[in-house]
Amino acid sequence: MNIIIVGCGKVGCTLVEALSIENHNIVVIDSRPEKVSALTDTVDVMGIVGNGVSHTTLKQAGIETADLLIAVTGSDEENLLCCVIAKKSGHCQTIARIRNPIYNEEKDFLQKEFGLSMIINPELTAANEISKVFQFPSAIRVDTFAKGRVELLHFKIGNNSPLCGLKLSKFHATLHCNDILVCTIARNSEEVIIPNGDFEFAANDIVSIVAKRKDAIDFFRKIGLEKNRVSNTIIAGGGKISYYLAKSLLMSGIKTTIIEINQQRCEFLSEQLPKATILCGDATDKELLSEECIEKAAGFAALTDLDEENILLSLYANGISSAKTVTKVNRINFTSVINKLDLGSIIYPRVITAEYIIKYVRSMNNSLNSNVEALYKLEDGKAEVLEFLLKENSAVCNIPLQDLKIRKNTLICCIYRNHQVIVPSGQDCMMAGDSVMIATSGYNISDIKEILED
């Protein structure tokens, strides 16, 4: 696929790195020569120094034959205009990054009137991910499928967990949890395992399971990870993510306090979020945190602009309270180190944004067999969990799973059919109209038939 990416900032770079691995022809555009050079020197892409709004620049980038243009500059207006000019200059689909809360309220209008294929708001997307883990604090990450009806829950095994040393073959009999399916195991931040019956759980493994919510709650109780729903939250930092998160939490009835050092920003937040408590102060001030009873907080989100501050704040919160903690990290260079720290749920906004866009790119390859409906990457892309909507002519339909020759390191995690969640056995079949969750490790797929051996 021919893809043009306008903007070589954090999100742009993450997109280029992820999409180039999937063998797309990519052209990047940015007005900053050093940003273009940094990408073209490390990734096999073509770079153009110029203004992405310019018709001449877009023509030079090959807009007439492009399949997709993604505008992720720092300016919402530039992104919108870039997409409009791209639509007029060629026949490509367009994606625009829009961050301003005012534009976000008019997203449907903008998408329709400007003919945009997709609008992505990184801060809102990150806030939604954080809100999900506050709703289910036993998990460190919650991914949703089938339009929110199926959940993939990730949790960390503690040193004293009953799972330690347990073989997967004895998992259901020991814990009496037949409706729980173990999908993937991330170990030492170095590998992601699609487990078989001989697999043995160990402390510090990150386990992902598919389950109905009530079954998951019962399972977490059995392994000692049961936590009550968060009732109050302290948010360090008053940026866009904090704004969207507070709005979501307040709508869910969760008391929310935001600590922000900038007076002008505090005034804005007070006007926009009248039900929240807004404090003007330094979130790293231990006395201020103590005054706000951080020791008794049910939830704590470190969302300042500095990774170092966020990491220290979450470590401090975990040390003095039992709060559900969430840590925002912008840089992704040291994920293997950061993931080993006791930071609760770690949110990488640019990675989340890239995942949403990659899902859309894969869905553009919709085939006779299936559509890609959702996609989540695990451990820096070492594994993926995808949702496919099966079509009538799919090569995998109406065949018992035990009779399908499924590739190594591939697992059919769940089938969603007629409002029912099916944890599949060998006798089950996939059928047209099903939403099917697939976990894979070691390769990328964009069509359900690719789970089969050649």
Range-by-range predicted roles:
Residues 1-454:
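Cytosolic regulatory regions of ion transport systems
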